[in-house]
């Protein structure tokens, strides 16, 4: 029995979180010939998560159990991540994966990308591959522009398509996240003819001084007015209200858990609202006791 097969038998399972992220700013500074956009953004994790359970075996097959309907395995980022890692490393092992889905889809919280990143990190361990984090980030970029930040695992300033990352230590406030009753297509927003794509870049110092714009906001609200309505409602509870990614989720920033919970309790009569705590270290690596 080779080393990888032995490790699979000794450490057969892991249950790990796949956390949400918030974009604390999102600037579009250009469009590339390949159609991708040059961005500047700041990522921070929150303690609201999907959960995935992985059990390694020698079957060679990747099997996923999920309550999500209508997503073929070939398109599911969890399955694609597992198969990509398996092909890259040339391993014969397989895995059973169970997804407990808590994060909304199409919400700008990065749930699918986070699921893919947790899959890469978990199976790298269970299959005893020993790949470093940068290698996993490079693999993740082949799955989607947001996957690398979840593998990176620390709050960061990001440029390029979001893959050039610099650790950024930030306050860890409390947030109230509102989930409007709509699904925003990222591709639709980035292809919108009215999206401004040539905004001036800023510096980290500009962001820290209060430059928190999201350049997707106007295009999103024009197409999904309920997102603008959610922002107006949140504005009753905080002066700092923002859109994460291309939405649909919006969030407000609060100085204490008590303040955030009071706002959430009030909002929950009419909206789906979640209290979350900011995290500079991903809950994934907190669970693994890594930094």
Curated annotation (Swiss-Prot):
Organism taxonomic ancestry: Bacteria, Pseudomonadati, Pseudomonadota, Gammaproteobacteria, Methylococcales
Gene name of this polypeptide: ispE
Record field: catalytic activity: 4-CDP-2-C-methyl-D-erythritol + ATP = 4-CDP-2-C-methyl-D-erythritol 2-phosphate + ADP + H(+)
Chain positions recorded as ATP binding sites: 104-114
Pathway per the UniProt entry: Isoprenoid biosynthesis; isopentenyl diphosphate biosynthesis via DXP pathway; isopentenyl diphosphate from 1-deoxy-D-xylulose 5-phosphate: step 3/6
Keywords: ATP-binding, Isoprene biosynthesis, Kinase, Nucleotide-binding, Transferase
EC annotation from Swiss-Prot or TrEMBL: 2.7.1.148
Family note: Belongs to the GHMP kinase family. IspE subfamily.
Single biological process term from Gene Ontology: isopentenyl diphosphate biosynthetic process, methylerythritol 4-phosphate pathway
Protein task: Catalyzes the phosphorylation of the position 2 hydroxy group of 4-diphosphocytidyl-2C-methyl-D-erythritol.
Active site residues per record: 21, 146
HAMAP family documented for this protein: IspE
Superkingdom field: Bacteria
GO MF, one example: 4-(cytidine 5'-diphospho)-2-C-methyl-D-erythritol kinase activity
Name of the protein described by the UniProt record: 4-diphosphocytidyl-2-C-methyl-D-erythritol kinase
